[in-house]
Amino acid sequence: MAIKRYFALNDNTITNAYMSDLSTLATGSNMGAADILEVFSIYGQTISASATSSAELSRVLIKFDVTGSGFDSIKSERTAGRIPSSGSVNFYLRLFNAQHARTVPVDYTLDIAPVQHHWQEGSGLDMDTYKDLTKDRNGSNWMSASNSPDRAWTTPGGDYLATYNYSQDFSTGLEHLEVDITPLVEGWIAGTLANYGVGIKLSACHEAYYSSSVWGFSGVKYVDGILLNTTGAQKSY
């Protein structure tokens, strides 16, 4: 069985984690040029005066060249007969665990969903103190899909479709991600779905718990970049 690899065209990590002062959320930070991608949830690193535990999240955006005009886009390769027709081939999203010295979480689920609209990769590198901001620069962040033109996410952390959703369970935290997303890619190739890539995040029950007194207001989903999540986890992943 022949296997062909396609490498990501754009990718970025977006986060609302605290900066080093533990009071400023890094919602404007960009990591589009970093050499790794991070998905995490940190619960209760700080506690507010109202005894509310903090909820810090990180998500991944990633896009592949599916319908571009280049000779090596997936659609171009199919037209040229270098990959099989629909129904005779499968497309897998594969990301590899980057080894490091830190303890990894166990027993969690990652969700994959198509991004709803265009976003910019950006050129940020700093994944420790989040100093690379998108102010006056191109790039997506936790609050915005792009800076020029300025386009805010409808919901902080990205806007995603409710269709073509996938997930993978992780038991040890050391596994690689490998998910069959064939129907989604075929939709991109056929043009029935615009290709803005996918977002990767922890499932809602594994992202950090957060509640607020504003929760009762109709339509409220977040407060100052923190997502309200009353079914979330009260531990970190």
Regions found by a protein language model. Give the residues of each.
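Secreted, disulfide-rich extracellular signaling modules
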Residues: 1-237
